[in-house]
Amino acid sequence: MLSEGEERALLDALDDEFKAWTTYDQVLRDFGPARPFVNIVDAEARHIEALREVFARYGLEVPENPWTGRVPRFASLREACEAGIEAEIANVALYDRLLRSTTRPDLLFVFRNLRRASQERHLRAFRRCASRGR
């Protein structure tokens, strides 16, 4: 059985992944299949699925995505990439906090993997995108 803090951590993680997926999906709707969004939106879907598996393991109800129709729109791909940088930095900070909320190996494994994806892959991709001006 999860503690209240662990449940809150899972909900916070899922909410953040929903927000990222919905934001990056909106960028693709607005600008077409632009890199790095076309790759990262797929990664965000995998992150959501990883969290859904944890929810199922503990018998928790998976909430609906609250971000549909509520994410920002950007004037350019560069602006979207700059926002992606900020979002991924915030995501790393979120997972730093969530990693302190549990000692459960399965939660730590998922939180570390999702943090690593933001820090080592998504953040780098958005920085490259912003530096290209697209």
Regions found by a protein language model. Give the residues of each.
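All-alpha RGS (Regulator of G-protein Signaling) helical domain and cognate RGS-like helical scaffolds
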Residues: 1-134
